[in-house]
Amino acid sequence: LKKGYMNGAHAIIKGKSKKEILFSSYVCHPSMANNELSGPILLNAVLKYLKDNFKHTHYTYRFILMPETIGSIAYLSKYHKYLKKNVFAAFNLSCVGDGKNYSMIESRSANTIADKALKCQIIKKKKYNIYSFLNRGSDERQYCSPGIDLPMSTFCRSKFGEFREYHTSLDNLKLVNEKNLKDSLNIIKNIIQSFDLGIYPTTKVKC
């Protein structure tokens, strides 16, 4: 990459462990509610949930908000070595504000702990969709690309490109509502709790 600048943001909540859980969303589609606003809203809500409810977390949490595709490429150009070493689960948040089926796009291997954690949550729902990495189309492409290969799966309600309002003026505030966003937040809350609260001390005393 050439020297230059790009507007973006990241936030880190340091935990007891350097091992990280990463959440990513994007800002680059003007005026679209589900395809654009819902992901960053959920990202912010997850950050607030952690700050308000955990005095100390076991894992470190990283939140990334960049323009889609080129933003994640730029971010990875700077941090990929550190992320490869420390991230053990990652989630891309996209199109999470409508009331359609809960959906996920698997990582390239389809067998990471992120895949298993997200799949465990959405299969509890009456209607859900699980897409292969072959159906990728958001920042999971970059984070899971060969040479990077982070353990990332994407969480959606309607998958991008598969709802009729996608990339039209109909993707507006009539399509999303607070209840749908809260329902999506609950999925992520449950994942966080399974990771951060599902840790138990073990004794090392012999005999």
Please give the residue ranges for each predicted region.
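Active-site-adjacent substrate-binding region
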Residues: M104-C207
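Proline/glycine-enriched tight loop/beta-turn segments at coil->beta junctions
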Residues: G15-E20
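Short beta-strand element of the conserved SAM-dependent methyltransferase core
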Residues: A9-I13, F155
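Acidic/histidine-rich catalytic neighborhood of metal-dependent amide-processing enzymes
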Residues: Y5-H10, I21-L22, V27-D115, K125-C144
